[in-house]
Design a protein with these regions (language model features):
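N-terminal core-binding DNA-recognition domain of tyrosine recombinases/integrases
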Residues: 2-4, 17-32, 38, 42-119
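Acidic, low-complexity proline/glycine-rich segments
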Residues: 2-12
Length: 119
């Protein structure tokens, strides 16, 4: 298990605000859609914890790289037996969260390019 980081705590706060306030205030009033966003992020965090040993408070921008997300989709398909439509729905929900996160914290918008420009 990784230690809590400032970045992890910040991302955790954004997740909490996104599912508890932002979705219902700015995206939809549908309880089913709100539940889908919440469940998607819960599944993603569960995947990171179970398969990568990353807790919610130790999240970083690396946790949202293309390769990690692709591995999560494979986990949904193979380990959780999700059909293609479900995987696509989960990916769409995660994509909306990442756009929200990128609008709040520019460092999370394009993590690979931020690393290159700092190096």
């Amino acid at each position: 298990m990784k230690k809590s980081t400032n970045q992890g705590v910040c991302i955790a706060r954004h997740i909490s605000f996104f599912v508890n306030d932002y979705v219902s205030s700015f995206l939809t009033e549908s309880e089913h859609t709100i539940k889908a966003y919440r469940y998607t992020l819960t599944l993603y965090i569960m995947y990171l914890d179970e398969k990568r040993g990353i807790t919610i408070n130790s999240l970083s921008s690396d946790c949202f790289s293309r390769s990690v997300i692709e591995e999560w989709i494979l986990w949904l398909k193979n380990d959780r037996n999700c059909c293609a439509a479900t995987c696509n729905n989960r990916l769409a929900c995660l994509r909306v969260f990442l756009k929200y996160l990128g609008s709040k914290e520019i460092d999370y918008l394009y993590p690979e390019s931020v690393k290159l420009s700092n190096g």
